[in-house]
């Protein structure tokens, strides 16, 4: 069983029912819906196909709605793409003008108030660099430092500039409401700056009467500076290395990745490493050696999941890419598991009752050579606490909630199942016997270590560890 999870971005390359079934069988655990592209009708159809494919394969597949976020962009050019050359003058304006080689509008009307002379402006993921020379009313006049081609709706980044945009744009609010009504299991918030950004998402969720975990995409320098508070406030993190490497020193991004992975594991929050993991497989049938190392090192660092973007959504080899990534992940896990239980912070003890019970369960399973860990969980927290120790035993999570089952598809080592509500520990034991016997990986007499709360079904009451011999 592969423990680490694979997140696949959906798109035209994997849009049919048959392709989605193949993607799941190849190793997809979470389907990412990128709300930067596509209409609500397209997403709805894709969602229904994912649920149908998941049902056919019998797998728990999480649906992640990734909001576009308040991305600052250029408006449009009257005659298509233009090429800027070093030394050219170029104006970005808040006025509605047809774009050309000398001027273009922007979606962000607060730009003139946020920038000043000498500020750096990056366009198209940093491929074009401008320097502000003057702010004149609605016009931000710049000079081109590094030239290149720019075109409609290309992104604008402002390294070192505090931008006064809301956490959610109007489009994000509409997309969030739609995604919740559609039935998504998780939501990713783009361009998070601090812990308070999650409040705006929760407000909309409360209005819709449905809360799901919110994943913080760390891609702004402010989020790096506030990473401990961000990890504490959100339900998980995506290390979005693409935009982060535009505004943050490129050479420091690997260290940010390692710090975030460690921090998330310590707090039992799932963490996804994303962007350019298998980029060459958009057009090639094999990854580069560097890409294989990148994926493996993310797993060795302790990431719960690795993510594919264009590789799976528009690439030429989406199924092969997932299969290849899965092989790399399994090989890295062999190395990881050979090291035994992974301490969170050497010498430090768990701070909570639930954390202490989870650690005890993992250590008992390790000492006794147990075949599995079993978590009865309503919210998924018990399973996530077990997951962070990276035990050799797979974690079987039993929950009455289908949403929790799908959300746990993002957590390392967890295989989740929807089961009827149990009223006592005796019923738990009976359920474990009947459910695990259905799985080919368990046999009569195998040792499993169970953890749950008593009374059952109450969130936050994990207080029990039980050693059980299957069928005994």
What are these regions (language model features)?
Residues 1-472:
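Non-catalytic helical/linker scaffolds that mediate oligomerization, partner binding
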């Amino acid at each position: 069983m592969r423990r680490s999870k694979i997140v696949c971005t959906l798109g035209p390359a994997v849009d049919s029912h048959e392709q989605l079934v193949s993607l799941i069988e190849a190793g997809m655990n979470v389907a990412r819906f990128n709300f930067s592209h596509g209409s609500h009708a397209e997403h709805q159809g894709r969602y229904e196909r994912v649920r149908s494919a998941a049902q056919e394969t019998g797998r728990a597949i999480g649906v992640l709605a990734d909001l576009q976020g308040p991305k600052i962009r250029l408006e449009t050019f009257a005659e298509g793409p233009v090429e800027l050359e070093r030394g050219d003058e170029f104006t970005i304006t808040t006025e509605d003008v047809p774009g050309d080689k000398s001027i273009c509008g922007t979606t962000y009307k607060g730009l003139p108030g946020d920038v000043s002379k000498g500020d750096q402006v990056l366009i198209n993921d940093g491929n074009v660099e401008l320097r502000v020379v003057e702010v004149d009313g609605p016009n931000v006049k710049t000079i081109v430092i590094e030239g290149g081609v720019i075109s409609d709706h290309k992104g604008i980044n402002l390294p070192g500039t505090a931008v006064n945009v809301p956490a959610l744009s109007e489009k994000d609010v509409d997309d969030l409401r739609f995604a919740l009504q559609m039935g998504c299991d998780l939501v990713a918030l783009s361009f998070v700056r601090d812990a308070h950004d999650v409040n705006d998402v929760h407000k909309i969720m409360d209005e819709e009467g449905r809360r799901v975990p919110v994943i913080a995409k760390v891609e702004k320098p402010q989020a790096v500076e506030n990473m401990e508070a961000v990890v504490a406030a959100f339900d998980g993190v995506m290390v979005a290395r693409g935009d982060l490497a535009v505004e943050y020193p490129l050479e420091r991004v690997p260290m940010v990745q390692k710090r975030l992975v460690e921090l998330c594991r310590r707090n039992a929050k799932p963490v996804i490493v994303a962007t350019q993991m298998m980029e060459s497989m958009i057009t090639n049938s094999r990854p580069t050696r560097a890409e294989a190392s990148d994926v493996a090192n993310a797993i060795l660092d302790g990431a719960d999941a690795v993510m594919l973007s264009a590789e799976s959504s528009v690439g030429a080899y989406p199924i092969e890419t997932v299969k290849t990534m899965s092989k790399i992940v399994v090989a890295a896990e062999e190395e990881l598991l050979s090291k035994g239980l992974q301490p969170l912070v050497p010498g430090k003890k768990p701070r909570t009752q639930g954390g202490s019970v989870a650690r005890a369960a993992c250590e008992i399973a390790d000492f006794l050579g147990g075949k599995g860990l079993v978590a009865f969980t309503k919210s998924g927290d018990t399973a996530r606490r077990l997951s962070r120790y990276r035990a050799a035993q797979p974690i079987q999570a039993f929950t009455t909630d289908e949403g929790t089952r799908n959300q746990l598809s993002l957590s390392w080592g967890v295989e989740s199942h929807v089961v009827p509500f149990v009223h006592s520990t005796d019923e738990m034991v009976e359920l474990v016997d009947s459910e695990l016997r259905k799985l080919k990986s368990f046999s009569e007499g195998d040792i499993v270590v169970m953890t749950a709360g008593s009374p059952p079904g109450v969130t936050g009451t994990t207080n029990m560890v039980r050693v059980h011999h299957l069928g005994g």
